[in-house]
Amino acid sequence: MERPSLSRRTSSSTVSTDGEGVYSRSTKERKRNFIVNSRLKRGGGHVRVNRSGRLGSVTMRPSALTRAHSQNPNSSLVNNSSAVSHLTKQRSLNDLHELNGPKHVAKNGLIPLTQRKPNCVWDDAPVDNDSTAGNLDSDSALPTPSVTTNEAADSSRASSPVTRVVAVHDNKKKIINSNISNAPPFNNTDVQASARPPAAGQDDSAADASTTKSSPVHNEVMAEPLPHSNNREVTQATNQPKWQIHSGSDIASEPPTLSRGNSLSLLANRKVPSTNVKKSQAELYDLGSSTSRTQQKLLIQRASSKFDIVEDDMDTNPSKRFSNPHTKHIMDLVRTQYRNVLRTRELIPEFLEKIRSSYSNNQNFDSQNAFNTSAAGTAGTREETISNGQNGIVASAETSKKDDGVQSASLNASMSARSHARQRSIHVPKTRKDTDYESIHQKLLQLWSQG
């Protein structure tokens, strides 16, 4: 017994074969591939907001897919003050293209999320995710215990407990001192004693323990909350911590220009949604750049305004004047309508003259058809009317003045015809809305030639 194959066969209606029986994909499969490919190339909302969404696995750390590297709260401690210049450079799309290469972007149409992180990623520092951001490492913050051979130094240290020297504000000194058991009140003598070089009998390990070195990330600086937006009146001295690293003679005399609050605000400003409007024209018209929907609308508006400027300028090259194909179509329609109006203006006086001559020469006027007139009645004035048809009714009136008898007879006939026309109206066939102007003109000319 044969086992049924696991591949699902598509119906014969959706599979079409080419000339030599080549299999072509079904419409369902084609639609599915188109949707998947288009969504991947465009990058959905979850990609633009830097959320992993369905593209990444659930167990992945957020640093693998997002810019959690750049959200490190200790960024200003690790990097020097030139981090601001790095951040301003990475705000342009051109640097992103230089990261990945134009060929890579042109092939896939999407910048990989793992390569979107900036150049100034702190590789030496431990990566903090959102849950541990802002917390000090308990292992690195504690001073390393000292193992010394000098008993005098051990006894002197045992009598007075080791105090962690941290440069903080006055309102935090009480909290720190209360956490340390049996600690004397915080004063300047402790700071000077801890910053003093070691004694002559102590070795290097004791010197390391006395200066309380910590990890290179934290540098014994307490995490300070960001200044609130309403505290702008506070001076800079109260906002900035005293960046002092008590390592003997290496005490920092001047604080760096970049504080933790400023670096975080710079990083937060990179995701401001209004940055898509502040693009230059070169970036807007760059087809390789990843554009959001608002950028696409801006691009369309600018392109359409360019089209209008080109079409309004009559001195431009006529082959380039109609950049928008719809404009040429509309202008052709207007020209044909104007041509039809001019033709109608020429035809109306001829038509009126024809009716006028028929009133004057034919007393037995057929009310059902105004064009069935005798050829003998119109033979006299036909050539003159055609020759003077360009000049309209004025020229035809001058030709009718040549014969006074014909004019008086035509007036009497027209008066009698008007009295009869009140009872019997002239039947004029109605034209449909979809009737072309050309057919009407041809019909009028044909009737004129028959008359």
Swiss-Prot record:
Residues 419-430 have a biased composition (Basic residues). Its main location: cytoplasm. Either Thr-10, Ser-11, Ser-12, Ser-13 or Thr-14 and Ser-214 or Ser-215 and Ser-247 or Ser-249 are phosphorylated as well. The modification Phosphoserine is found at S70. Keywords: Cell cycle, Cytoplasm, Meiosis, Phosphoprotein, Sporulation. One of its GO terms (biological process) is TORC1 signaling. Residues 129-162, 228-242, 362-376, 407-417 have a biased composition (Polar residues). It comes from the Eukaryota. Residues 1-35, 122-164, 176-264, 362-437 are annotated as: Disordered. Residues 7-17, 203-215 have a biased composition (Low complexity). InterPro entries: TORC1_cplx_su_TCO89. It is found in: Cytoplasm. GO terms for cellular component: cell division site; cytoplasm; cytosol; TORC1 complex. Component of TORC1, which regulates multiple cellular processes to control cell growth in response to environmental signals. Tor2 is essential for growth. Nutrient limitation and environmental stress signals cause inactivation of TORC1. Active TORC1 positively controls cell growth and ribosome biogenesis by regulating ribosomal protein gene expression. TORC1 negatively controls G1 cell-cycle arrest, sexual development and amino acid uptake. The target of rapamycin complex 1 (TORC1) is composed of at least mip1, pop3/wat1, tco89, toc1 and tor2. Belongs to the TORC subunit TCO89 family. This is Target of rapamycin complex 1 subunit tco89. It comes from Schizosaccharomyces pombe (strain 972 / ATCC 24843).
